Each structure stands twice: as C-alpha cells, then as structure tokens.
Swiss-Prot record:
Keyword Transferase: no
Cofactor(s) in the UniProt record: Mg(2+); Mn(2+)
HAMAP family, alphabetized: Non_canon_purine_NTPase_YjjX
Pfam families assigned: NTPase_I-T
InterPro entries attached to this UniProt entry: ITPase-like_fam (IPR029001), Non_canon_purine_NTPase (IPR002786), NTPase/PRRC1 (IPR026533), YjjX_NTPase (IPR050299)
Protein name, as recorded: Probable inosine/xanthosine triphosphatase
Length: 169
C-alpha cells in the first residue's frame, strides 16, 4: 500500500477481505509527482504512482489511494472531492472511484489559495490529524461516512476487473 495512513490501510484491508482470505496490508511511504493537494487528473496519476511504487514481486497486489478535487458543474463551489484507488498486480493497473462530496465554500476558497484540504478542515472541525483519523467526510456527514468507508469503496471499485478476470481479458 502506497501510504501509511491508517484510514487508507484499513479501507483497503476491508475491500480485499471481501474477496480474498489471509489479507495482509503493508503500508509504505512513497513519493508521487502529484502535488500535496491534487486536482482532477493529478489525483488519478497520484493513485497510480502510489500503487506502482509500492509494488514488490513479493506482493499479489499493491494499492494507491489519492483524494483530490475534481471540477464539476451543478455544485456550490465548482468542485467535488473524490477518493481514487489504483490496484496493481505487476502487469495490470485498474482504477476505482469512491463517492464524491462537496466541501463548504470556505474550504474550497482556501484550497484554491494554496492550502491543503486537511489543513483547512482541521481548523474548521477543531480535530487535529482529521485525515488520519475519520476524515473530513466523517465530520461533514455527521458520522455517517468515514474516510475508511471511502477507501474501501474506491478499492472495491478498482478490484472489479481482478475479481472478474474472465470478463476483462
């Protein structure tokens, strides 16, 4: 796993445990060319690079997860946040998205000035290291959805071609 973030690791574990036995997730720090606060295609590229850089022939799969803002019409701020997962088996890389949601206008305004979502949301929520705990989505959804949930869903979506190999030849 191309991250040591506990919410991402746990989400990936839950996704893989839906389909595989004896799942072990090893988190490793990797660097990517994506900026600290990615937008649009930078988010997808960051997830792919995390998965590929975390890969070792000792692993069956590696995973990269990256959250970022995507431009979108019909939103208050013009942006939605999506968590993107990439799963890599040494040959094939697949992508999955989690559910998208919108940050408050004041958060997006600060991000567009160069701050990271996590930094702004810590101030808004008063919760230190929010992104490594339950995530901003947990705070904004009043506890209904956690960052672990978003990670699980995005990794599950990325696993679809692997769990249906005969359909994705």
């Amino acid at each position: 796993m191309g991250s040591k973030n506990p919410t991402k690791i746990e989400g990936a574990r839950r996704a893989f445990e839906q389909y595989f036995d004896d799942v072990e997730i090893v988190g490793v720090e990797v660097s990517t060319s994506a900026p600290p606060q990615p937008f649009d295609a930078e988010t997808v590229r960051g997830a792919i690079e995390r998965a590929k850089k975390a890969y070792s022939p000792d692993f069956d799969f590696s995973v990269g997860i990256e959250a970022g803002l995507f431009r979108s019409e019909c939103t208050i701020t013009g942006y939605l946040d999506f968590q993107v997962a990439a799963v890599y088996d040494g040959e094939r890389c697949t992508i999955g998205f989690g559910p998208g949601f919108e940050y408050p206008k004041l958060v997006v305004e600060e991000v567009l000035k160069g701050k990271e979502v996590g930094e702004v949301m810590e101030k808004v929520s008063g919760i230190k290291n929010l992104g490594k705990k339950v995530g901003a989505v947990h705070y904004l959804s009043k506890g209904a959805i956690s960052r672990t949930d978003l990670s699980r869903i995005s990794v599950t979506m990325a696993l679809i071609p692997f769990i249906n190999r005969e359909m994705y030849l």
